[in-house]
């Protein structure tokens, strides 16, 4: 496939992940995508025809992450960037809920928001070392401040910050590791099935736009296409070559507090 850059993206079937697929394709990358179900696969196939390498599966399953990387290499020959983007929200789950609900939700949220990132990076790492590639993770405004979710979600996103720092240090100089912290963004993010939130979508919550506007100094709720530019910067071998261990916030100033 020559010198064309190759990126692999998890959580690619909706929201920020889907917009990442669009943006990286527009930037000339070859793209492989991990999606959750056949419905998301069909959506990508309709928009991109056969231009993507698509894997359907559970991001929590290490074999699925290994399959994503194998199929990426089989089709495109190499891997330049792995984007760990899959995630779920906790719909402001309170510590005052029954322990069984908290415990099962915590496990599911951390399995997807944290452990799946480790799994995907582990699967991608041998190929990234060959190309001196990079990792970009999706953190959150909730990695830096409270108010963007319940305590389970906020704890999971704080964990991502630790991963970025530890892995950037461990993997330098061969592989760069960074993250983007979106906030104030309306997406179709769902919640843990263990709490009955798997059929819910953030974008369908009544008043969500107005709530975000009230929390954001810039005064509007972002769309996924508004927050993808930092990923392209961090993935770039030219513009991002001296960046590692860095988290770029793109949250309309939400982490600063209310205006």
Curated annotation (Swiss-Prot):
- Binding-site residues for substrate, renumbered to this chain: 140
**To which pathway does this protein belong?**
Aromatic compound metabolism; naphthalene degradation
What is one process in the GO biological process aspect for this record? catabolic process
Reaction catalysis annotation: (1R,2S)-1,2-dihydronaphthalene-1,2-diol + NAD(+) = naphthalene-1,2-diol + NADH + H(+); cis-1,2-dihydroxy-1,2-dihydrodibenzothiophene + NAD(+) = 1,2-dihydroxydibenzothiophene + NADH + H(+)
- The EC code for this enzyme is 1.3.1.29, 1.3.1.60
**Active site per the UniProt annotation:** 153
Query: Domain of life here?
Result: Bacteria
The terms under GO molecular function for this entry are: cis-1,2-dihydro-1,2-dihydroxynaphthalene dehydrogenase activity; dibenzothiophene dihydrodiol dehydrogenase activity; oxidoreductase activity, acting on NAD(P)H, oxygen as acceptor
User: What cystine linkages occur within this chain?
Assistant: none
Q: Which InterPro entries match?
A: BphB-like_SDR, NAD(P)-bd_dom_sf, SDR_fam
Which keywords describe this protein according to UniProt? Aromatic hydrocarbons catabolism, NAD, Oxidoreductase, Plasmid
Q: Where does NAD(+) bind?
A: 8-32
Which Pfam families does this entry report, sorted A to Z?
adh_short_C2
The family assignment reads:
Belongs to the short-chain dehydrogenases/reductases (SDR) family.
Summarize the protein's role.
Answer: Catalyzes the oxidation of naphthalene dihydrodiol into 1,2-dihydroxynaphthalene.
* More info: Encoded on an unnamed 75 kb plasmid.
Identify this protein by name.
1,2-dihydroxy-1,2-dihydronaphthalene dehydrogenase
Q: Which gene encodes it?
A: doxE
